[in-house]
């Protein structure tokens, strides 16, 4: 179950964020890694980690909650209800690929039965549906195309593209976990050109 947490001071927020980013890197490389390894990767002591996350279960729950928020923010930043559909589709594709690449471990272990996951999933899928409806209305998608099918194809293409973006990071986070922005832009353009040329 993913719980909400109390707001933190800015310095505490930075520390918590560093720990969560380190947890993503370390656990992606080794899901059995210890809290000591995560603390070391974050550049904090085990005591500091425990002060913020009392147990491994609490840390994992916070990591999942953070990943969900990043995924939701990826949709929010694309303005799917208001931006011109071509712009929103490109923004959304880049944002979602970036989030899936940077938070792949946490997103991969989300429980499909968690109410928070269910709610956020329904919300983002509804927003994606609105965007595809707008794209069809504007002529980007042919009027006889089934939008449910089109969205499934889109999501499958994004997931395939992300596989090539997965960063090979060491537990110490030596490699940069951020996907290359130019490559994200290239892949988003390729995905949308391929998709829309088939259903447009």
Predicted regions: what they are:
Residues 26, 70, 96-103, 131, ...:
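A short secondary-structure junction motif
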């Amino acid at each position: 179950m993913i719980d909400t947490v109390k707001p933190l001071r800015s310095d505490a927020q930075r520390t918590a964020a560093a720990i969560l980013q380190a947890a993503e890197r370390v656990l992606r490389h080794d899901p059995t890694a210890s809290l000591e390894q995560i603390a070391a990767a974050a550049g904090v002591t085990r005591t500091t980690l425990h002060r913020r996350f009392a147990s491994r279960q609490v840390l994992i729950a916070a990591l999942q909650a953070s990943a969900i928020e990043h995924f939701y923010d990826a949709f929010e930043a694309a303005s799917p209800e208001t931006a011109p559909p071509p712009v929103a589709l490109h923004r959304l594709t880049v944002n979602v690929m970036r989030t899936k690449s940077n938070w792949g471990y946490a997103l991969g272990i989300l429980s499909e039965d968690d109410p928070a996951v269910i709610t956020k999933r329904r919300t983002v899928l509804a927003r994606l549906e609105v965007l595809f409806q707008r794209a069809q209305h504007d002529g980007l998608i042919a009027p006889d195309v089934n939008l449910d099918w089109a969205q499934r194809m889109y999501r499958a293409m994004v997931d395939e593209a992300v596989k090539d973006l997965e960063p090979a990071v060491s537990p110490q986070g030596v490699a940069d976990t951020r996907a290359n922005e130019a490559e994200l832009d290239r892949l988003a353009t390729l995905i949308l050109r391929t998709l829309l040329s088939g259903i447009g």
